[in-house]
Amino acid sequence: MPRRGAVPKREAVADPVYGSKMLTKLINQVMLDGKRSVAEAICYGALDIVRRKTGREPLEVLEQAMKNVMPIVETRPRRVGGANYQVPVEVRADRRQTLGVRWITSFARQRPGKSMKEKLAAEIMDAANGVGGAVKKKEDTHRMAEANKAFAHYRW
């Protein structure tokens, strides 16, 4: 079976309002059923709430939140001699960003009540302050990698 070359990575287009590629990725993650305009309204509304509540530039708060959420190491399962080991590996920069955005949106969705823009704003502000579900997920991921450091020599 012939193999075709690797598919080239597509560059994300910066969003029209803030000119941020990270915000485009957040919008894409929030989007459900291809409804981009709804996702944009949610994200821009959330950033407006962040601006009102913190008095800071919302993109700065989002950048800080992403820094606090993006994992440096994660564990990947590796089968060795009939046993599965969780092997700690470093996370690539693009995956780091993807995981950060994914965790922020998923933990925002899990928050009780209110509208999605309020939940997303709350999760972004919590992450920027170093608390919240997404930051806890990152810490758990790092703790798991630290606990399995003994299997680091199985890295591939």
Curated annotation (Swiss-Prot):
Instruction: Return one GO MF term.
Output: tRNA binding
The terms describing its cellular component in GO are: small ribosomal subunit
Q: Name one GO biological process term.
A: translation
Which NCBIfam families does this chain map to?
A: rpsG_bact (TIGR01029)
Subunit details: Part of the 30S ribosomal subunit. Contacts proteins S9 and S11.
Q: What does this protein do?
A: One of the primary rRNA binding proteins, it binds directly to 16S rRNA where it nucleates assembly of the head domain of the 30S subunit. Is located at the subunit interface close to the decoding center, probably blocks exit of the E-site tRNA.
- Kindly provide the name given to this protein in its UniProt entry: Small ribosomal subunit protein uS7
Q: Which organism is it from?
A: Desulforudis audaxviator (strain MP104C)
Q: Which gene encodes it?
A: rpsG
